[in-house]
Structures are given as C-alpha cells and as structure tokens.
C-alpha cells in the first residue's frame, strides 16, 4: 500500500495566487491559524495551542461582560438612534409633543388599551397645543378647523388601523379605505338610512326598543309591589339596542332584554374594546394567549353562521312569497344596488355589513342613551324641565315617535344633542393618512405619509365654539341649527357615520318615552350626583373608559337608578341632595 505525506513546504491550498501581504496577514491571523490546523495536522497541535493562549489573554475581559451589559449597550444604541432621529432627522421634529411620543409608539398604545386616551390627550393639548406629536411618525389634531380640513378631504384616507374591522377578508362600510369603493358602498346602503325608509321601519324599532324596556321595567315594579325599583340603565339600554340591531340586521331577535343578558352582546362589548389596539390583537393570536380569544372566535363563528342563515332564510321566504318584502335592514342590504354602477352586494358583503352594523351600531347608540340619562340625573333642574315638556305634550298612554319629538319636544331633543356634545360616545382618536399630499395645520407642515389622529371629542369642548363647555346646558341647541352642525359625534365629511339617522330614531324615542312614563332618580348610595361637585362647582361625571366608544368604567356601580311608574295626574317629585 502506497502512503502519502503532506509536504511542509507550503501551507497554501491550490488556488489563485494571492499577493504576499494578503498571504502573510491570513497566515498570521487566528482564523488563518485554525484553518491551517485543520489542513495540517502535524502543525495543528502547535497552532491550536497558540490560539488558545491568545484567547486566554482576553478571558478576564470577557468575564466582565454580562448579558445585562450587552442588553444595556443595545438599548443605549437604539435610544441614541431614536433621539437623533426625533430631534434631527424626523420631518415632525419642529412640532411640539412629549419626548416619549417622539421615541416610541408604546405611550399611545398603553393609553389606548387602558381606555385613558381621552384624559391623556386633554393633558397633552393643554401643554402642547392643538397639533402635537402623538407617535414617532404621527400627529394628533384637535382644532375644529383642522379636523374639518382633514375629514372633509378624500385625500386623507382611513389608515391601516381600520383593517381590524374587516370580516375576515371582506371589508365593510367602516373599514373600506379606498374612496371609490367606500362611495359605492354608501350609495348601496344609503337608501335604508334615510328618514323616509326608517319611518316605515319605526314600529319594529319601537317594539324592540322602548316597548321592550317598558315591559321589563313594569314587570320589575310589579314584582316589587309597585314600590320604587332599581334598574341599571346602561345594561338595559345596551340590551334593547342590541335587540333592535339584530332584528333589523338579521330579521331575527335575540330577545336579550327579556332574558336579561346576552353572551353575544357581552363578547361584542369586549371585542369593541380589543379592536382599539391592533398590537394586543396580534398578541392574542399567539399561544397561549390565543386561548383567551377562543370563546370570542366561537361566538363570532356562530354569529357569522347566524347571519348567513338569516340571508338564506330571507331568500327562501321571498322565493315562496315575494308579494311583500319585510321592512328591515337585512332586506335593504339584499336589495341594495349602486345606482351608478348597478352593482349589488355579494352574500359575504351583506353578512359583513350586517355584523358590523349590529356590533358597532348597538354599542355606540346605547352609550349615547346612557350618557343622556346620567347627565339628566346629575342636573335635576334640567331633568325636571325635560319631564315637564314631554308630559305636557303627550298623555300617559301615548307612544312617542321620532316625528313627535322633532315636532313637539325641542327641549328633550336639545338634551340629547347636549349629551352628545358633552360626553360624545365616539370620543376616541380616528387615524387618517395621505401618501401623496401634505397639509399645514396651525402653522406646522404635516408631510405625506404621516398618520393624523383626529380627536373627535375636542371640537365638542373647544372654547372657540362653546361658552363654558364643561357645563351641561341643553339651551345651546334650542333654535340653533348652526350649533347642531358643529357636532362631530357622527364624524364629518364624506366618511361620516352612515347610521346616524337610525341612531337618532332610537335615542329620541327611548329617552322621550322613559321620561314620559317613569320618574327617575339616583340611588341613595350613588357616588356621583348633583351633590358631588368639582372645583368649578359642576357635578363630577362617573369615570369612563374610551375605546372605540366611551363606556362607563364601572357600570354595575355607577349606572343604577330608581324608577317609579308614573300614575295619571301625579307629578314627579324631586329628591333633595346634600353636599358630599
């Protein structure tokens, strides 16, 4: 057997000729030595030993470096980069704002998910003005003129945030971002939401709205031997608006008010909170956090199946008897056609719109009614005046309609307007963005690609529009159509709330009929009332959380009131309050 030996003449492998300097550098390097050790086992032991000695020389230094020090170095490097970007590179560097907001989105995300975004924004506006940095590449705007400029322009589209409202891959009227598609959908759905169509659907709205409340409350009073009875006006108005929307959107009824609860409604409220934070939703999609969302996913699948079945049942009904179509939202959506393109919605689009209308429409409307009752209870003189108006105009057995309120109850209507101004149900921030057009607001140039967060609450409390804005004063809206146009509760411009007319029918009929038929008062142990005031002498509102809508933080504690059935010829009595 022939044997071979590696000649120790050269330690180079065959290949291109290298410059002498490069060979010397390579052969003298640690890497080169290890490379030689692997190729030349005779020389390898000496080479490895030499390398280990050289590494050992640095061991004391390596021992001093901990994981925490490495992380600290990374943090300092990242912070330095963000500081340089925020103060020297960012196109928003000349706009005032909190330091933390310039460096990270975490500040905004924490406030949003905690429901404290309104309080934080109010403090920021007082310190930085009507335009300030909200995130590293986003601003928050608060002046009414600026809000009109942004929301009134098709250039500023809804930001990617709204994708979370999609029904899977199917967008709806809330989440559509392309102006052309959004305009087509509004043309398809618009006919249902005009007052002429809603007037025909009003009996259904009253049946599942105020009449359902009256049935429940009368039963509670009867069970209590006719004595004053405690109810929760947040829960009950939430249940009936949910029933209204389910009847209109699906042609079917959950009967939530008669059962006293609805699991779907509770999960709907929870998801409305979670939808405000895409980061949290992303986290909840991962194990083990995804287990938290399993009940909601099951509910949503059931709701989607419920919606799909409703569409199929309606089509079957029409196939059997098409002489008279039901007057509800479901039928309107099935028949909906864009008058320009003649395009109808697909079954998936009908389902997406029905689900969104039920989830969003029920929560926001019930929130508005809840704040109206809360403010009336805080201002007893205003409550007495509203009660006197409605009881002077209509008898006990008269069911007040939307038309009745508009024609005969201007003060009751003004109370609802003022509640929407004082405590707007849509009090969060809504983001817009333009990738092609910049805009100058309050002297600051906002370049294309910047997210603009619109504070819909700010115009309702802005001193340029309202005197003494913190005071609940319905007189602002008496004989003042201009003030009514100043409200931003239903947004503004081409993407304003399509369902606002339906909301008005629900709000006015429920509030007016409750004031006509019941004496309402705070419970004896209520923490918030006219007896507990702030430094300006104004009643303190119950604490609230603001997500997509504004909700009470503790509804079980703070949304209780005592009701007494009004008897013919008996005047309401006013409770006396003592200072807290």
Curated annotation (Swiss-Prot):
User: How does the protein's chain sit in the membrane according to the entry?
Assistant: Single-pass membrane protein
Report residues carrying sugar chains: 28
Names of required cofactors: heme
Query: Which residues span the membrane?
Result: 61-81
- Which key words tag this protein in UniProt? Glycoprotein, Heme, Iron, Membrane, Metal-binding, Monooxygenase, Oxidoreductase, Transmembrane, Transmembrane helix
Q: Report residues binding heme.
A: 497
| Enzyme Commission no | 1.-.-.-
Q: What class of enzyme is it?
A: oxidoreductase
Q: Per the record, a Pfam family? A: p450
Instruction: Explain the induction of this protein.
Output: Expression is under the control of the secondary metabolism regulator laeA.
Give the InterPro entries listed for this entry: Cyt_P450 (IPR001128), Cyt_P450_CS (IPR017972), Cyt_P450_E_grp-I (IPR002401), Cyt_P450_sf (IPR036396), Cytochrome_P450_monoxygenase (IPR050121)
UniProt record, GO biological process:
helvolic acid biosynthetic process; secondary metabolic process
The cross-references to PROSITE patterns, in alphabetical order and at most eight, read: CYTOCHROME_P450
- GO MF term list: heme binding; iron ion binding; monooxygenase activity; oxidoreductase activity, acting on paired donors, with incorporation or reduction of molecular oxygen
Q: Where do the coiled-coil regions begin and end?
A: none
Q: Where is this region: Disordered?
A: 1-32
Where's it found, cell-wise? Membrane
Q: Does the keyword GTP-binding apply?
A: no
Q: Copy the pathway line from the protein's UniProt record.
A: Mycotoxin biosynthesis
Q: Give an example GO cellular component term for this record.
A: membrane
- Functional note: Cytochrome P450 monooxygenase; part of the gene cluster that mediates the biosynthesis of helvolic acid, an antibacterial nortriterpenoid. Protostadienol synthase helA cyclizes (3S)-oxidosqualene to (17Z)-protosta-17(20),24-dien-3-beta-ol (protostadienol). The synthesis of protostadienol is followed by several steps of monooxygenation, dehydrogenation, and acyl transfer to yield the final helvolic acid.
Q: Which family does it belong to?
A: Belongs to the cytochrome P450 family.
Q: This chain belongs to which protein, by name?
A: Cytochrome P450 monooxygenase helB1
The record's gene field reads helB1
């Amino acid at each position: 057997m022939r044997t071979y030996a590696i000649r120790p003449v050269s330690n180079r492998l065959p290949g291109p000729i290298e410059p002498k300097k490069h060979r010397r550098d390579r052969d003298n390097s640690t890497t080169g030595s290890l490379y030689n050790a692997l190729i030349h086992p005779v020389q390898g032991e000496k080479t490895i030993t030499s390398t280990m000695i050289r590494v050992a020389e640095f061991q004391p230094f390596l021992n001093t470096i901990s994981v925490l020090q490495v992380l600290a170095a990374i943090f300092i490097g990242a912070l330095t980069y963000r500081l340089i970007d925020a103060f020297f590179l960012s196109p928003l560097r000349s706009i005032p704002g909190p330091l933390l907001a310039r460096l990270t989105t975490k500040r905004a995300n924490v406030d949003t998910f905690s429901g404290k975004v309104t309080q934080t924004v109010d403090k920021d506006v007082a310190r930085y003005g009507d335009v300030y940095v909200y995130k590293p590449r986003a601003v928050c705007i608060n002046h009414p003129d600026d809000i009109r400029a942004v929301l009134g322009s098709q250039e500023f589209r809804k930001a990617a945030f709204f994708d979370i409202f999609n029904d899977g891959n199917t967008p709806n009227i809330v989440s559509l971002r392309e102006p052309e598609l959004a305009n087509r959908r509004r043309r398809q759905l618009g006919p249902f939401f005009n007052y002429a169509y809603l007037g025909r659907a009003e009996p259904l709205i009253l049946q599942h709205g105020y009449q359902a409340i009256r049935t429940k409350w009368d039963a509670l009073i009867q069970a209590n031997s006719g004595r004053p009875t405690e109810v929760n006006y947040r829960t009950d108005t939430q249940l009936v608006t949910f029933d209204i929307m389910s009847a209109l959107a699906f042609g079917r009824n959950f009967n939530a008010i008669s059962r006293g609860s609805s699991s779907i409604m509770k999960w709907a409220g929870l998801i409305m909170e979670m939808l405000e934070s895409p980061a949290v939703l992303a986290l909840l999609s991962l194990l083990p956090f995804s287990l938290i969302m399993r009940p909601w996913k099951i509910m949503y699948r059931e709701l989607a199946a419920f919606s799909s079945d409703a569409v199929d049942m309606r089509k079957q009904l029409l196939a059997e008897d098409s002489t008279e179509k039901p007057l509800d939202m479901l039928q309107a959506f099935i028949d909906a056609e864009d008058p320009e393109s003649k395009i109808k919605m697909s079954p998936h689009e009908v389902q997406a719109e029905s689900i969104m209308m039920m989830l969003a429409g029920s929560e926001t409307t019930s929130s508005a009614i809840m704040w109206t009752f809360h403010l009336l209870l805080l201002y007893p003189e205003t409550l007495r005046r509203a009660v006197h108006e409605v009881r002077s105009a209509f008898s006990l057995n008269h069911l007040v309609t939307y038309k009745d309120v508009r024609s005969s109850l201007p003060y009751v209507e003004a109370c609802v307007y003022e509640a929407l101004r004082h405590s707007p149900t849509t009090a969060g921030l809504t983001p817009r963005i333009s990738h092609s057009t910049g805009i100058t607001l309050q002297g600051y140039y906002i370049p294309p690609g910047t997210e603009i967060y619109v504070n819909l609450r700010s115009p309702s409390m802005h001193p340029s529009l309202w005197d003494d804005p913190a005071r609940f004063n319905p007189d602002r809206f008496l004989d003042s159509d201009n003030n009514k146009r100043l409200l931003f509760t239903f947004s503004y411009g081409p993407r304003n709330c399509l369902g606002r007319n339906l909301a008005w029918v629900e709000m006015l009929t429920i509030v007016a009929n409750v004031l006509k038929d019941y004496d309402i008062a705070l419970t004896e142990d209520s923490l918030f009332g006219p007896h507990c005031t702030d430094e300006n002498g104004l009643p303190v509102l119950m604490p609230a959380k603001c997500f997509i809508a504004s909700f009470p933080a503790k509804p079980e504690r703070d949304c209780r009131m005592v009701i007494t059935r009004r008897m013919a010829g008996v005047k309401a009595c006013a409770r006396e309050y003592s200072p807290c």
